[in-house]
Amino acid sequence: MALLLGVDTGGTYTDAVLIRDETTVIASAKALTTRGDLAIGVGQAVRHVLEAADVSAGQVAMASLSTTLATNALVEGQGGRVALIYVGFKERDLQAHGLAEALNGDPYLILGGGHDHAGAELSPLDEDALVAFLTAQKSQVSGFAVASQFATRNPIHEQRVAALVAQVTGRPVSASHQLSAKLNGPKRALTAVLNARLIGMIDRLIGRAEDVLTDIGVTAPLMVVRGDGALISAAQARARPIETILSGPAASIVGARWMTGA
């Protein structure tokens, strides 16, 4: 008998459900969402559902978490302060697709480099300017985003920037080519900025949720619901929190389809 545990943190309530063999709901429970530390509400809901089902935490084979945290953070303009490294673009490109608004005064660097549509280097990466920028900003931001011209055709400049960010600052970095395959540079940059902004809060939520589940006795791996309803590992969600946007609504739709047999 495989027991699956699902937890959803909403704006008001945190819900937990236990499903047996992917076919039968054996118990559900609810707790108030604890906004200061969402994991507290997660723990309360999980304890309630285990008690209602009269099963031990060790019987849970997989745990999944859906959350509106990323969605709410972007809508409310929350998240960490980040810096954008914009390689091979012009200053005016910041005005495209809401990129300047997303930065909202956060620092950025227009850096020499980039490639053409065929992946050929247009100009060398200006590493001296990059290192100077990283040194100045490393204590001022929680993370970095990098978008290079035509990085989806040749990501080497983004990869080099990411390596230097790690070396000089030790901060997390979101590279646009790892988040989107689209050619549109400003859109990729926007995705990278939003991802970088969310990394800290999603990392804290997942870490605390894992700690709470471990304390309860749940040893099963924690999965996170993606915005399309699929499950990704906790490690993937930590690196790409942008994929958890619409996690909560997606979980609701998947659940409704399962319950109705649609």
Where do the protein language model's features map onto the residues?
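N-terminally biased helix-coil "hinge/interface" segments that flank
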Residues: M1-A262
